[in-house]
């Protein structure tokens, strides 16, 4: 947590060279792939060890689940076939022995009950209300100084159609300053940021405290306030649909937002982004506070998104699989 990509790489090398035993808990999939030789999986109220890295564990666990489901399906089909035969011919004298034989077969067949997994995958899907035109974003000569420290110095770049840009660098404060300027939350000291008239933007800030502190609204009312102008009275089932995607269901939607955990607040902010229907997404560390299942869901959602993305992340796998361009702030 809180390490940039270079620091994470250093830690990976250190642990690989370390001759002792390492027990690590991490939500970084790439890190687990590089460092780990064994994975201890705590699920289904059991603890099970896999020999291999994170990717091996994931494929093995998914394959085992698929295998059990396939076996159950075959068993259920066979049970149905036997039951049909028994019901049809149990009263038939010439077929009674066959019916009795099939009843014995039926008694031996079992369907393995899959226990409930503790893992829950949210659904992250961003739909655009409209596509952006050709002119998206031009950043020219951007500079910013905060408390006497030059964070951004003459930054220039353009956002092209289908671009998904990862912003990386050693200075997190500088990256956040750039994201805030792009989102219109702050102004540069020098330079210009020009967005195309057809763009609509949604911003995920690294610090979301201003959205939740001192707010006593319920989850459903909190999200409703971000509905499009004129739709503040959007029916509850519509709003709850977005919350449901992020695993808020039942009475959860009536919880006050100021008592939510860090991960729950992040899921709220993602619900808010999905509600907006923007064609450009700006995200500053969207995987902070999330578990592996939620990180995977966000990762897949951004990969599938048809619009443009500008994001900052310390998650190597996230950057590798989402971004088609990298901007390194030095």
Model features per residue range: what roles?
Residues 1-70, 129-330:
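ABC ATP-binding cassette signature C-motif
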Residues 63-152:
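Flexible nucleotide-interacting loop at or near the entrance of a catalytic core
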């Amino acid at each position: 947590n809180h390490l940039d990509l270079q620091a994470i790489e250093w830690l990976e090398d250190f642990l690989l060279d370390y001759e002792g035993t390492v027990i690590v808990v991490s939500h970084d999939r790439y890190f687990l792939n590089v460092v780990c030789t064994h994975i201890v999986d705590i699920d289904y109220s059991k603890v099970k060890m896999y020999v291999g890295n994170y990717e091996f564990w994931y494929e093995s666990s998914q394959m085992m689940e698929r295998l059990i489901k396939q076996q159950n399906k075959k068993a259920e089909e066979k049970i149905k076939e036997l039951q049909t035969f028994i019901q049809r011919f149990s009263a038939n004298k010439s077929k009674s022995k066959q019916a009795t034989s099939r009843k014995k077969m039926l008694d031996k067949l079992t369907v393995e009950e899959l226990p409930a997994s503790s893992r829950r995958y949210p659904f992250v899907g961003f739909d655009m209300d409209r596509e952006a035109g050709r002119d998206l974003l031009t950043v020219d000569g951007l500079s910013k100084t905060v408390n006497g420290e030059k964070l951004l110095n003459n930054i220039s770049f353009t956002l092209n159609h289908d671009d998904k840009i990862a912003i990386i660098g050693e200075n997190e404060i500088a990256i956040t300053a750039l994201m805030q300027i792009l989102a219109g939350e702050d102004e540069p000291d020098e330079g210009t940021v020009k967005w195309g008239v057809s763009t609509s933007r949604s911003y995920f800030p690294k610090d979301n405290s201003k959205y939740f502190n001192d707010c006593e609204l319920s989850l459903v009312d909190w999200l409703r306030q971000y509905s499009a102008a004129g739709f503040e009275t959007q029916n509850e089932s519509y709003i709850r649909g977005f919350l449901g995607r992020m695993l808020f269901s039942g009475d959860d939607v009536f919880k006050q937002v100021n008592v939510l955990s860090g991960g729950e607040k992040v899921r709220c902010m993602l619900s808010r982004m999905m509600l907006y229907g923007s064609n450009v997404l700006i995200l500053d560390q969207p995987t902070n506070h999330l578990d592996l299942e939620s990180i995977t869901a966000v990762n897949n959602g951004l990969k599938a998104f048809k619009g443009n993305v500008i994001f900052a992340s310390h998650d190597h796998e996230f950057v590798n699989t989402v971004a088609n361009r990298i901007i390194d702030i030095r």
